[in-house]
């Protein structure tokens, strides 16, 4: 509710019990879940999804306003809605600030190597309802913080109305205007410098080609110490095999809540067909497809050269106590020197291209030379082309995957249509091949069959899909006091697929059957004959890579989602035969329906608004599974993968020669095509 009149009468006491974390429990049942504090008195009770003691307190006392102590929501029982406004004194805002100050004393437990995981309200913030002397300092801290905010607010208003305050405000405005002018001047200087560099790079070389064939002169180096010279001489006398990184075992540094992007990029790079099509795109020869900076610094050679030092900086990190031999399995932990490649914080070309960034990143990750990459250029390209993911907020990995593939598809289609004359024939052919892989690798088709109950007439519609969003059975959505029976702590993936393809009855008479209305003329003013019907979804064409998105959320209360933390049992081999239409089963070999597990994206945490994403990927080059946790990579077994709490599953079809598509004669009748959504509709008598 935007305006609640009961908030204007709110008067908070400075020693309210909500400021003491030890009292964040129900006074009747002592539970700490969904605790609501009355804003009229010091009473604390549980919500309606626990024992409903807060509502009973309102019925007994008539106090309408209550605040949830962790989510900081305010609810009015008289208005029967959540409150969004505040009283003129701003007490609710100050109260929320005080509670955040109390909770901020325990946030150090969540800091892990420069990355803070924002846990849910039911995380480490829960304090047992014990009366110990430790709660008194926290209450005093909250009271002091609230009084300081009130005093600062009063002094700020008084100072702004004084003559000195107005003069200071005017001076600040002048400084901001001067800073804007300086920034504009700096921007103009950068633009002039960029144009000058472009002109110098495009100018013809002054030296002849004969001079370029000579070997470069000696490079000046710093004088080495005695210990360094001894190590170099020992290495020259006893040459050893240089330490190598296994191809694909390259970590991606977390640049600030970018675990969702890192996990998806690791999965896409481990899908062999998707990876190979982007590796075949060479930016140095495909100039029109990937417009480069004219200074030539965007090219990535086999080893870092001096010309690319402005774009990529190589940092040598020495691991202590490790042997200088063997492959790097977990971001350089088993070798004496691991190389970290740090991309430039701006895209490497004037024209931002996700295809170019994917090519560069995949080439580095599968070169076997880098143990860790900081994907700054990829992140800024995503920010520029997908504004919804701009910033360092927590994001959903499934939404990012869909948006990334959509933008890559749009980019390839626009390059092939708008600049067709300028692109050579070989590059146009290469672009079409990549676009075909992007469009078809996840593309499948569903058969939507609606059966009229009155005349048993069946209408079939073919719809495209790129992933299957599977819902949990109904028993996991029914919450009774937050308790889940022990026999429902696990769910089968096959059960979720069966629920997706089961027959459901449409509510009421809402279906206009073509057979029942066939004798009715179009000019007839009488309404259409509506009847009851059944609907079923079946797989009509299987994709090369099957994406299964597990919808791990349920609604608990009003406008509140929570995660379903049930373990889903999935196998390494998945057979899709039971979920396809019957005509497909008779026309194809059984091996066509077999899928092998390729990757798993896992979400750690109790809610989708916070947590952490990691990925389990199968390395096709080495034949092993690897757990990709940002910059840390560990080899694991398939048994460990199957025990994870999966969020997105990727299965690759074993045989791709046969087309898992139903032939046209099996569905005879009328065919309707739609250019808008590319759907085909078949009707059967």
UniProtKB/Swiss-Prot annotation:
GO CC annotations, alphabetized: cytoplasm; nucleus
Gene3D superfamilies, per the entry: Cysteine proteinases, Zinc/RING finger domain, C3HC4 (zinc finger)
Domain USP as annotated: residue spans: 250-654
Biological process terms in GO annotation: mRNA splicing, via spliceosome; negative regulation of phosphatidylinositol 3-kinase/protein kinase B signal transduction; protein deubiquitination; proteolysis
Cell compartment(s), UniProt: Nucleus; Cytoplasm
Chain positions recorded as Zn(2+) 1 binding sites: 4, 6, 76, 79
Binding annotation for Zn(2+) 2: 26, 29, 46, 53
Entries under InterPro entries matching the protein: Papain-like_cys_pep_sf, Peptidase_C19_UCH, Ub_carboxyl-term_hydrolase, USP_CS, USP_dom, Znf_RING/FYVE/PHD, Znf_UBP
Pfam families reported for this sequence: UCH, zf-UBP
Annotated catalysed reactions: Thiol-dependent hydrolysis of ester, thioester, amide, peptide and isopeptide bonds formed by the C-terminal Gly of ubiquitin (a 76-residue protein attached to proteins as an intracellular targeting signal)
Molecular-function GO terms, alphabetical: cysteine-type deubiquitinase activity; cysteine-type endopeptidase activity; histone binding; histone H2B deubiquitinase activity; zinc ion binding
Disruption phenotype: Usp49-deletion mice exhibit increased resistance to lethal HHV-1 infection.
Function of the protein: Deubiquitinase that plays a role in several cellular processes including transcriptional regulation, cell cycle progression or innate immunity. Specifically deubiquitinates histone H2B at 'Lys-120' (H2BK120Ub), a specific tag for epigenetic transcriptional activation and acts as a regulator of mRNA splicing. Antagonizes DNA double-strand break-induced ubiquitination of H2AX thereby participating in the maintenance of genome integrity.
PANTHER family attached to this UniProt entry: UBIQUITIN CARBOXYL-TERMINAL HYDROLASE, UBIQUITIN CARBOXYL-TERMINAL HYDROLASE 49
Family membership noted in the UniProt record: Belongs to the peptidase C19 family.
Name under which the protein is recorded: Ubiquitin carboxyl-terminal hydrolase 49
């Amino acid at each position: 509710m935007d305006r609640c009149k009961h908030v204007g009468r709110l008067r908070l006491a400075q020693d309210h019990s909500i400021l003491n974390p030890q009292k964040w429990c129900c006074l009747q049942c002592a539970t700490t879940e969904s605790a609501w504090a009355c804003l009229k008195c010091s009473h604390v009770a549980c919500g309606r999804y626990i024992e409903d003691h807060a509502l009973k307190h309102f019925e007994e006392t008539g106090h309408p306003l209550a605040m949830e102590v962790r989510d900081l929501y305010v609810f009015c029982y008289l208005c029967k809605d959540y409150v969004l406004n505040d009283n003129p004194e701003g007490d609710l805002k100050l109260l929320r600030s005080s509670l955040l100050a109390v909770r901020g004393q325990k946030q150090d437990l969540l800091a892990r190597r420069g990355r803070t995981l924002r846990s849910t309200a039911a995380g480490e913030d829960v304090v047992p309802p014990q009366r110990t002397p430790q709660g008194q300092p926290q209450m005093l801290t909250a009271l002091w913080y609230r009084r300081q905010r009130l005093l600062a607010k009063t002094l700020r208003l008084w100072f702004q109305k004084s003559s000195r305050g107005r003069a200071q405000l005017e001076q600040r405005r002048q400084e901001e205007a001067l800073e804007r002018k300086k920034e504009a001047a700096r921007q103009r200087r950068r633009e002039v410098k960029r144009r000058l560099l472009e002109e110098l790079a495009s100018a013809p070389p002054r030296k002849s080609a004969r001079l370029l064939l000579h070997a470069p002169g000696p490079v000046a180096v710093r004088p080495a110490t005695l210990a360094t010279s001894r190590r170099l001489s020992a290495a020259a006398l006893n040459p050893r095999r240089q330490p190598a990184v296994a191809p694909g075992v390259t970590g991606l540094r977390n640049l600030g809540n970018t675990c969702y992007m890192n996990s998806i990029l690791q999965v896409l790079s481990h899908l062999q067909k998707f990876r190979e099509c982007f590796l075949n795109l060479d930016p140095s020869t495909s100039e029109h497809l990937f417009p480069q900076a004219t200074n030539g610094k965007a090219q990535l050679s086999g080893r870092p050269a001096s010309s690319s030092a402005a774009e990529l900086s190589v940092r040598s990190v020495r691991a202590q106590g490790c042997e200088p031999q063997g492959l790097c399995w977990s971001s350089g932990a088993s070798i004496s020197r691991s190389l970290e490649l740090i991309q430039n914080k701006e895209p490497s070309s004037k024209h931002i291209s996700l295809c170019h960034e994917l090519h560069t990143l995949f080439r580095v990750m599968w070169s076997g030379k880098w143990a860790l990459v900081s994907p700054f250029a990829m992140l800024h390209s995503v920010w520029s082309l997908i504004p919804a993911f701009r910033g360092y907020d927590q994001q959903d990995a499934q939404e990012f995957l869909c948006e990334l593939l959509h933008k890559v598809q749009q980019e390839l289609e626009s390059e092939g249509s708008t600049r067709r004359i300028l692109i050579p024939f070989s590059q146009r052919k290469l672009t079409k091949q990549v676009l075909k892989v992007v469009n078809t690798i996840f593309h499948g088709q569903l058969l939507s069959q609606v059966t009229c109950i009155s005349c048993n007439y069946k209408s079939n519609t073919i719809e495209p899909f790129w992933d299957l969003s599977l819902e949990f059975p109904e028993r996991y959505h029914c919450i009774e006091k937050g308790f889940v029976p022990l026999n429902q702590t696990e769910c089968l993936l096959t059960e979720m697929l069966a629920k997706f393809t089961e027959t459901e009855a449409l509510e009421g008479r809402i279906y206009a059957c073509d057979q029942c209305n066939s004798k009715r003329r179009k000019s007839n003013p009488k309404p259409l004959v509506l009847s009851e019907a059944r609907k079923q979804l079946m797989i009509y064409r299987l994709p090369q890579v099957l994406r299964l998105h597990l919808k791990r959320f349920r609604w608990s209360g009003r406008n509140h989602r929570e995660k379903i933390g049930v373990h889903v049992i999935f196998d390494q081999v998945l057979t899709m035969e039971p979920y396809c239409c019957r005509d497909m089963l008779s026309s194809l070999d059984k091996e066509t329906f077999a899928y092998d597990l390729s990757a798993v994206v896992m979400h750690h945490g109790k809610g989708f608004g916070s947590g952490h994403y990691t990925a389990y990927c199968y390395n096709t080059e080495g034949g092993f599974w690897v757990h990709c946790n940002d910059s840390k990579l560990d080899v694991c077994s398939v048994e460990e993968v199957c025990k994870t709490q999966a969020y997105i599953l990727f299965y690759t079809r074993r045989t791709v020669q046969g087309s898992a598509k139903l032939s046209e004669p099996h569905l005879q009748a009328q065919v309707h095509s739609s250019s808008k959504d590319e759907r085909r509709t078949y009707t059967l008598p």
